Amino acid sequence: MKKLILIGIADLSLASCKTISKQYVVRPKSHTETQGTATFTQKKGKVEMDLSVFKLKPGLHAVHIHEFGNCSATDASSAGGHWNPSKDDHGKWQSDHFHMGDIGNLDADKDGQARLTFSTDKWCLGCDDPMKNIIGKSIVIHAGVDDFHTQPTGNAGGRIGCVEIK
């Protein structure tokens, strides 16, 4: 019996050290040509997102995690609203008021290319904690900038790109 318990504990500690990496394609929405990739890597209790997008209009574009992993609608409305398991106000990540879907803004250069990396211990890939698990959610790229205070969306504009996180 003691051997079985020790093996179970060893299995749990090895699982928590495992690196998980998933890559997804950005799908164009709202009759745009938005394209790119989103890679999520979970390692040592943190998730890093690496979002590379092109064919954007130059300037700032809001990025949020939305509540449903469904990008089927032409305007990405099927992704639902911002993922907000704690029911907090919209805001800037790590400010007094923000929710788990608040990521920030991509800054597209004159050629329409942008990259955003983001790392947090507040997300996980497939864990049992619904307050952290981003599997089954989506990333939505918006036409406008997130002003970090307009409720509930940051006045970010239309949805021009969508990623289903599976």
Residue ranges and their predicted role:
Residues C17-L60, I65-K166:
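N-terminal leader/targeting pre-sequences
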Residues L4-L12:
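Sec-dependent N-terminal signal peptides
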